């Protein structure tokens, strides 16, 4: 045989585990019984009793398969005993659990409908020595130390009892195998025998000097009917090579053996109690615990090795480790397992049909895997390698065949799932929601106020193995208001060892201490540097994060001075509380504390905001609003706004992605916004929290400020912007050569709040170099929104620079001016389109609504851009520049119209975008693009696109669908033209085949120009019809390449946002817009391909899509050169990845906004030709482009522009939707002749989570509707001569701008457009540029836009096929976020309703300024709208999600899992508490807490989402509460909500 302790972290409770009992899973129905029982032994439940009087019931499994689903709840902590639990005994036949405590209390527990309750209670007041169930489970034998014995039925009826008068105590009692007799062992070595009716039969002395510790039979504990003896007849049988998983054949014993353990360590094996010649085992162990396996062939004897000299025992080093010896039925020693355990083994039990031996030693629980047969060489090798590797993740480093790697990895699959998946990564565990339906059951305890700390401390514990594992600690920081900070559990390195052997003794020692000491222990563990260590920051010292005069349009002077640390909080001297000076909270203090989050509140304690303070968390973590009835006669109402938080892969970026949020006080009283300038010293207010640009017409930062701010933000991101340092940005004007870097002076002040503060360069200025696109600024935004390019000089054209992220791919691209024209200074091609890419990703910040003063239309001069895009050089296409991804994330601080400060972290690479367009290039592109510079960076795509990859988090998409975003590939494509190149060869090859078809079709379409486009649009199948396809399957098409606009003049065709969508029958699948601007370099196309290639993995997924996505992309002739029809710029393409289709419904309108894809007029045409122009008809580009765009603009019909007609036709598939929507949205404005190209660029709202360049996972969750509400800036037309951009149209209404986005989305993008809008909104919540966008518009403007767009476009879309299409796109949409969808459905109601909901949102918004977007909580009116529009925003989401939406949601979930939780931040969930029922009898309100809550309290509450409970909180003791929660709550968010509630003064 073979036995080995399981690899992995040590499992431990918070107190000594005193007893164990295991039972197998029971068939749920009669139908399951015929199946092999082995299945039931593979899963089971372990009961533990501990020193705190808590019984733990924990799920265990031995199948070593990660794909098996587990129960929603895998641990129960059963409270009720008043002293330590000394015995636990399962009754398997009746599924009951008996537990006994040291005071003699006996509870019999039974589980019903998921909850455990006490069925029987027996308390005689005397200590229980043993409790045993009969083998058939019908009777219980209870023996007391004082000699009293009792036999009763399983239902609690007493059969008989007897008093045995002895001089010694009874130590154990057991049933004989036939249940006809009972045997009792005594402390003086005697055995007493009685029959089942209580008559005394015998009294035998077994040992004169040694007392009997325990007795047992090598016979199954329970006789459970076994329907099958075969090990292989179960459908999920796994071969014996699983080692310990293989089960032995039962031993057929002629006669059971009675095993008696003595205090000396000897064990006697007897045929019966009167056996005169027993087999004696001299174990050589002391404190022996012995138990036969279920099969009866193996006896495990555990104990401490006896020392030669007892005097040495006291010395720790001289203590020997505990050992487990295995013997057979003949008493022969078979195997010895040496453990590293240095404490006595208190209890052992077999489980999982003898393949596991569970041992308890102190608070630790060890699992031993046992192989009964001769161990195979494979098993020995597995154990040897596993013990060397120590971690599962190291298995993949070995050069072993997949089958062996899989086998080796089974050694690391735990039998008992640890409470924290990775003990060394507690931070992730508490910061992000658990996957799937896993529910966390926690206990929250309060410790006494500590004057040093300044307020009461609360610790959140995860219930596990009957104990509590501390995971978070929070403390109150204000005596005036209920405000708290939550500590980072990783502040102390020791926390990593919490489960390590080194700390076990500490944990144990503390276990038996009082609760307060326990909490202290956890405090130490959770935040070693916490309150006490940082005495400098005492109590209410923690300033609230707020800006002094929140209502003031200008930043407080102090804030300006400290613009470098926008996130640091400043206490507002108001309410009579003394203002804190910076000295009180030195910067070091904050870092010392390592706070995760802060809970702020208004003075009344009715509104709370949860602000993320850690760099890896979104700034906005949620809000809680309490509403009470008159006279407090009714239960209070809670509304929770909860943004979905997703993890960003640190592999790609170690920079935090933030949702733009306002870090401010409650809206009510102190509208304080965390200004960009909060004193650095201010504590936890997070130093590194980027503030989303809040652009309000009233406020703007000076270039210097903005630069400083950007610098500080970038510094945090490790992003270097050449421009940052200088007022003037050296913009690598993607000049014709693309080498030249032009410096643009930074305007002293951004004229428009919408301006993005990047590098302090004004977008308008930047645009100077390239012909400026006259983009009609959205009404709200100032005409000119300077876009700053984070990266000044793109001299590093090379991809490496791109990779650097430090630089924007192109300064201009960096510009994320709110709606500014794409002012790619160098690249004449308008990057606007590119910029348009929806800012779905948190990293992206749409420029403020301000549009750069419409720069002069980009003249044809743009063509030179082409030059600039040299193949190798090509560092930044306008496109690439557009995505200057290499930079990483830029954090921007802005103020919204209400004066709230918002920080947005957007991918470093930003494209200038028309005012109406959002700069967020591709979600991932911005950061990603860095790579683009050089193909040489091929591998870079992922790397450089730190964001990039994040942005593209790949969602699992139905196979039929194109990858929502070619994850990295598409992002990279967008973000990194060069990177694209990298992949391009692959993609090229992959796409080329399709591209050719598409190219031909495209060419034909292009030739037809618009006309073909229309047909194209219609034909979903043709590559050329990609455009048409877009409409057909717009979602994929939705991916608009923000980069499109960036295409160089020669790449103007490159601008082709040919939304790959339009190509290929997969149109629906191919949502990628291959907009890569055709660089002068053919590589561009290659890049596009490569971007896709990067997606290759996806590509299989999307291969169809790819061709579709990229068919017309041949970007101009140049692209054409890369015949792969998809010449879209991978960069662009990547961005495009986000399929708007998903958000097709309401999203479309916003996408239109995004749509502002601006290209030089020439570019515009080029773009048109872009994907659609077949290599052969580069000249067609314009026509093609229109065609492409036409296909891209389903709304053309709605657009006033006649030129769109062609497009319109193509849109027809989605036309109904988009057109109607657009029409409502004033599509006319949106659609501009130039727009189609823009459209084609389709901003690819980051709606598609994966697509978002921000790549902050947040995006995916984003609700689609938010995009809509965002109504990005009106699409900025490149006002290229080619298309009379009808800037006026765009300008006409911000609303209009959304339509353009829609246009972009049109190809199926419409949904996307809408999604984009929604996305943005969501993003805001999620740290996306959403707020930026809204802010760009100016809140009012945005509101108008949102409401109109939402009503019109959304409604239209919703009403039209949009809903249907959206559903079609739903895969993407769901990825993005269903909220949008929900909203769309709502929208279907009527514009008025929408408006109402909008108003509601605004009123209900958490933030003070009713005008401003919902305070970042919802990242946008839309969000609020959706959620608040009907306090059941989630309902709309839910309704939308029904059917296909539901599937999409599942898809998203699956993909999230695949991505390892990489993705975009999700949308904001709006939830309300469940109203309690009135109990007439007791005259109280009641809620059913499933037995978890034991005390009535007005603070008890339950939160529901879509009809299911996702959180419950209730009092169980004076200072203890239970807190149960599941997705979408993360531990930090749930804890914050609980803290807000604990101090709630309202009834």
From Swiss-Prot:
Keywords, in A-Z order: Cytoplasm, Methylation, Phosphoprotein, Repeat, Ubl conjugation pathway, WD repeat
Domain SOCS box, first and last residues per copy: 364-414
Residue numbers spanned by region Disordered: 530-580, 1374-1414
Chain's role: May be a substrate-recognition component of a SCF-like ECS (Elongin-Cullin-SOCS-box protein) E3 ubiquitin ligase complex which mediates the ubiquitination and subsequent proteasomal degradation of target proteins.
Protein name: Tubby-related protein 4
Organism of origin: Mus musculus (Mouse)
Listed GO CC annotations: cytoplasm
Compartment list: Cytoplasm
Highest taxon of the lineage: Eukaryota
PANTHER family tied to this protein: TUBBY-RELATED, TUBBY-RELATED PROTEIN 4
Compositionally biased spans, kind Low complexity: 533-546
């Amino acid at each position: 045989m073979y036995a080995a302790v399981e690899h992995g972290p040590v499992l431990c409770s918070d107190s000594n585990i005193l007893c164990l009992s295991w039972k197998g899973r029971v068939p749920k129905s009669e139908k399951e019984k015929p199946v092999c029982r082995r299945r039931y032994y593979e899963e089971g439940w372990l009961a533990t009793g501990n020193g705190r009087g808590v019984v733990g019931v924990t799920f265990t499994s031995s199948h070593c398969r990660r794909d098996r689903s587990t129960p929603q709840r895998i641990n129960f902590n059963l409270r009720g005993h008043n002293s330590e639990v000394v015995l636990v005994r399962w009754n398997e036949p009746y599924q009951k659990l008996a537990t006994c405590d040291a005071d003699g209390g006996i509870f019999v527990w039974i589980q019903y409908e998921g909850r455990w309750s006490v069925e029987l209670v027996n308390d005689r007041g005397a200590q229980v020595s043993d409790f045993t169930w009969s083998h058939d489970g019908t009777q219980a034998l209870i023996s007391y130390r004082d000699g009293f014995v009792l036999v009763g039925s399983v239902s609690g009826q007493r059969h008989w009892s007897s008093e045995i008068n002895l001089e010694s105590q009874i130590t154990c009692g057991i049933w004989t195998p036939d249940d006809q007799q009972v045997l009792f062992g005594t402390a003086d070595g005697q055995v007493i025998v009685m029959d089942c009716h209580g008559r005394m039969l015998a009294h035998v002395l077994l040992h004169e000097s040694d007392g009997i510790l325990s007795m047992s039979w090598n016979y199954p504990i329970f006789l459970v009917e076994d329907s099958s003896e075969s090990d292989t007849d179960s459908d999920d049988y796994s071969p014996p090579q699983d080692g310990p998983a293989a089960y032995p054949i039962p031993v057929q014993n002629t006669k059971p053996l009675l095993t008696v353990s003595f205090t000396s360590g000897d064990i006697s094996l007897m045929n019966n109690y009167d056996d005169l010649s027993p087999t004696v085992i001299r174990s050589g162990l002391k404190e022996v615990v012995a138990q036969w396996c279920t099969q009866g062939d193996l006896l495990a004897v555990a104990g401490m090795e006896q020392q030669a000299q007892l005097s040495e025992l006291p010395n720790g080093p001289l203590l020997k480790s505990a050992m487990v010896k295995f013997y057979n039925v003949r008493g022969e020693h078979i195997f010895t397992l040496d453990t590293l355990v240095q404490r006595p083994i208190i209890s052992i039990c077999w489980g999982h049909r003898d393949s596991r031996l569970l041992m308890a030693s102190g608070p630790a629980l060890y699992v031993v895997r046992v192989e009964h047969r001769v161990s195979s060489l494979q098993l020995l090798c597995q154990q040897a390698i596993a013990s060397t590797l120590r971690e599962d993740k190291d298995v993949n480093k070995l050069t072993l065949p997949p089958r062996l790697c899989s086998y080796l990895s089974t050694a690391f699959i735990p039998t008992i799932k640890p409470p924290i998946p990775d003990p060394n990564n507690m931070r992730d565990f508490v910061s992000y929601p658990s996957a799937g339906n896993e529910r966390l059951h926690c206990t929250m305890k309060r410790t006494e106020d500590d004057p040093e700390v300044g307020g009461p401390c609360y610790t959140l514990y995860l219930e596990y193995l009957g104990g509590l594992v501390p995971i978070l600690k929070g403390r109150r920081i204000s005596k005036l208001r209920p405000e708290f900070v939550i500590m980072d559990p990783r502040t102390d390195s020791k926390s990593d060892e919490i489960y390590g052997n080194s700390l076990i003794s500490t944990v144990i020692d503390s276990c038996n201490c009082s609760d307060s000491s326990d909490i202290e222990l956890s405090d130490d563990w959770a935040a070693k540097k916490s309150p006490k260590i940082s005495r400098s920051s005492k109590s209410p010292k923690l300033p609230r994060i707020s800006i002094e005069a929140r209502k003031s349009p200008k930043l407080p002077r102090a804030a300006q001075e400290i613009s470098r640390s926008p996130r640091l909080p400043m206490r507002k001297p108001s309410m009579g509380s003394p203002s804190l000076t910076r000295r009180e909270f030195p910067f070091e203090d904050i870092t010392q504390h390592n706070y995760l989050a802060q809970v702020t509140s208004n003075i009344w304690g009715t509104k709370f905001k949860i602000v993320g303070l850690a760099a890896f968390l979104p700034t906005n973590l949620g809000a809680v609003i309490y509403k009470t009835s008159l006279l407090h006669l009714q239960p209070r109402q809670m509304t929770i706004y909860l943004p979905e938080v997703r993890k960003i892969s640190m592999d790609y970026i170690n920079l935090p992605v933030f949702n733009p949020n306002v870090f401010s006080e409650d809206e009510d009283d102190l509208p304080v916004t965390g200004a960009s300038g909060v004193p650095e010293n201010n504590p936890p207010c997070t130093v590194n929290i980027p503030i989303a640009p809040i652009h309000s017409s009233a406020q703007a930062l000076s270039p210097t400020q903005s630069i400083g701010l950007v610098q500080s933000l970038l510094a945090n991101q490790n992003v270097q912007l050449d421009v940052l340092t200088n007022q003037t940005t050296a913009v690598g004007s993607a000049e014709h050569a693309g080498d030249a870097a032009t410096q643009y002076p930074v305007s002293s002040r951004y004229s428009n709040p919408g301006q993005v503060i990047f590098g302090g360069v004004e977008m308008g200025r930047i645009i100077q170099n390239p012909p400026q696109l006259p983009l009609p600024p959205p009404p709200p935004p100032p005409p000119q929104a300077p876009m700053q390019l984070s990266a000044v000089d793109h001299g590093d054209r090379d991809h490496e620079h791109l990779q650097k992220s430090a630089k924007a791919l192109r300064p201009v691209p960096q510009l994320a001016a709110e709606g500014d024209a794409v002012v790619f200074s160098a690249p004449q091609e308008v990057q606007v389109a590119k910029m348009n890419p929806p800012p779905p990703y948190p990293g992206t910040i749409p420029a403020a609504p301000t549009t750069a003063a419409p720069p002069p239309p980009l003249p044809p001069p743009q063509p030179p851009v082409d030059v600039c895009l040299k193949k190798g050089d090509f560092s930044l296409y306008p496109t690439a520049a557009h995505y200057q991804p290499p930079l990483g994330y830029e954090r921007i601080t802005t103020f919204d119209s209400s004066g709230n400060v918002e920080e947005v972290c957007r991918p470093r690479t930003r494209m200038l975008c028309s005012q109406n367009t959002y700069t967020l290039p591709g979600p991932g592109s911005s950061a990603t693009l860095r790579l683009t510079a050089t193909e040489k960076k091929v591998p870079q795509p992922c790397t450089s696109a730190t964001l990039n990859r994040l942005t593209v988090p790949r969602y699992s998409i139905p196979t039929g669908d194109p990858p929502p975003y070619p994850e990295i590939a598409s992002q990279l494509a967008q973000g990194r033209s060069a990177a694209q190149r990298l992949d391009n060869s692959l993609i090229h090859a992959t796409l080329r085949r399709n591209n050719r078809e598409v190219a031909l079709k495209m060419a034909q379409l292009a030739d037809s120009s618009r006309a073909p486009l229309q047909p194209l649009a219609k034909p979903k199948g043709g590559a050329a019809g990609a455009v048409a396809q877009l409409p057909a399957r717009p979602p994929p098409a939705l991916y608009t390449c923000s980069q499109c606009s960036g295409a160089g003049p020669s790449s103007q065709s490159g601008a082709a946002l040919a939304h790959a969508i339009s190509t290929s029958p997969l149109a629906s699948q191919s949502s990628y817009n291959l907009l890569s601007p055709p660089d002068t370099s053919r590589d561009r196309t290659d890049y596009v391909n490569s971007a896709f290639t990067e997606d290759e993995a996806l590509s299989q997924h999307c291969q169809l899509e790819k061709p579709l996505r990229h068919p017309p992309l041949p970007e101009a002739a140049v692209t054409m050169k890369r015949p792969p029809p998809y010449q879209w710029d991978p960069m662009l393409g990547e961005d495009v990845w986000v399929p708007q289709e998903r958000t097709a419904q309401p999203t479309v309108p916003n996408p239109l906004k995004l749509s502002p894809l601006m290209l030089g007029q020439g570019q515009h045409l080029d773009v048109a030709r872009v994907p659609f122009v077949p290599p052969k008809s580069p000249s067609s580009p314009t026509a093609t482009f229109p065609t492409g765009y036409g296909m891209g603009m389903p709304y053309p019909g709605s657009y006033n522009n006649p030129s769109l007609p062609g497009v319109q036709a193509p849109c027809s598939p989605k036309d109904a939707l988009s057109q109607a929507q657009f029409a409502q949205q004033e599509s006319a404005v949106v659609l501009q002749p130039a727009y189609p190209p823009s459209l084609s660029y389709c901003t690819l709202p980051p709606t598609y989570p994966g697509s978002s360049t921000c790549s902050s996972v947040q995006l995916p969750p984003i609700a689609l509707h938010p995009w809509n509400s965002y109504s990005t800036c009106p699409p900025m037309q490149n006002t290229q001569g080619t298309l009379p951009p009808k800037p006026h149209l765009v300008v006409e209404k911000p609303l209009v701008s959304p339509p353009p986005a829609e246009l972009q989305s049109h190809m199926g993008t419409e949904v996307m457009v809408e999604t984009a809008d929604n996305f943005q909104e969501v993003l805001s919540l999620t740290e996306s540029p959403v707020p930026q966008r809204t802010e760009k518009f100016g809140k009012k403007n945005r509101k108008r836009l949102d409401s109109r767009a939402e009503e019109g476009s959304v409604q239209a879309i919703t009403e039209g096929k949009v809903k249907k299409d959206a559903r079609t796109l739903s895969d993407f949409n769901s990825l993005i976020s269903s909220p949008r969808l929900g909203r769309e459905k709502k929208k279907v109601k009527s514009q008025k309703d929408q408006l109402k909901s909008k108003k509601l949102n605004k009123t209900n918004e958490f933030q003070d300024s009713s005008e401003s977007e919902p305070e970042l909580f919802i990242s946008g009116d839309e969000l609020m709208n959706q959620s608040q529009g009907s306090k059941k925003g989630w309902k709309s989401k839910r309704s939308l999600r029904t059917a296909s939406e539901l599937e999409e949601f599942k898809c998203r979930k699956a993909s999230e899992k695949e991505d390892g939780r990489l993705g975009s931040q999700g949308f904001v969930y709006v939830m309300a508490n469940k109203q309690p029922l009135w109990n007439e009898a007791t005259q109280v309100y009641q809620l059913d807490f499933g037995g978890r809550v034991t005390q009535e309290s007005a603070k008890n509450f339950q939160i529901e989402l879509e009809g299911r409970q996702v959180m419950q909180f209730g009092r169980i003791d004076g200072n203890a509460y239970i807190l149960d929660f599941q997705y979408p709550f993360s531990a930090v968010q749930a804890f914050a909500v609980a803290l807000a509630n604990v101090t709630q003064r309202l009834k």
